[in-house]
Amino acid sequence: SLMNAVGIDVSKGKSTVAILRPGGEVVASPFEVSHNPRELNGLVTLIKSLDGDTKIVMEYTGSYYLLVAMFLRKVGLFVSVVNPILVKDYSNKSLTVRKGKTDKKDSIKLAAFALDRWNELPLFSAQSHTRTLLKAFNRQYNQYTKLKVMLKNNLISILDQAFPGANTLFTTPARKAD
């Protein structure tokens, strides 16, 4: 059956959408959709009117994509939210698109990526996505905690070199265990 790849480049208040089929067939050149119920419902109507299988791909950048992804999932469409790095690597290798970031090109890139990775596209679910984000936040938290300890030790060592014995002048207030 026909494959319709919908690339959505989400930004604040609006998205740019492009629809491709295999063999470079352009179903819809990049067009803009505002994030209001009327225009989003219009997009849903358009997507649902396509013959064949349809998959929607967007990147998780910023926080704007979440609203759009959840809206499109709620009406029963296949939505995949992918890591921007994957798309960037893919487009650098496979597409000879002139450099320069434009939303129009990005929506086409996303649709092309969707066609290329058609069978591996993960279905977006709010739960699994939340888990992914929590893992990332946890990783970041741990990195910053390590960095904080490193910087404190560095500061103590510098203080020690500049003013030997100065560390003994400071008392650390008793801390309650976390």
Segments from the language model and where they lie:
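Gly/Thr-rich phosphate-binding beta-strand-loop-beta motif of the actin/hexokinase/Hsp70
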Residues: 2-21, 110
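Short, glycine/acidic-enriched loop or turn micro-motifs at the edges of active sites
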Residues: 12, 62, 86
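Short glycine-rich, Thr/Ser-proximal phosphate-binding strand/loop in the N-terminal lobe
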Residues: 13-38
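Short, basic/hydrophobic alpha-helical segments
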Residues: 38-55
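Acidic, metal-coordinating catalytic cores used for nucleic-acid/nucleotide bond scission
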Residues: 57-67
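Short alpha-helix plus adjacent loop in nuclease-associated cores
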Residues: 73, 80-123
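Glycine-rich, often acidic, oxyanion-interacting loops/wings at catalytic, nucleic-acid
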Residues: 138-178
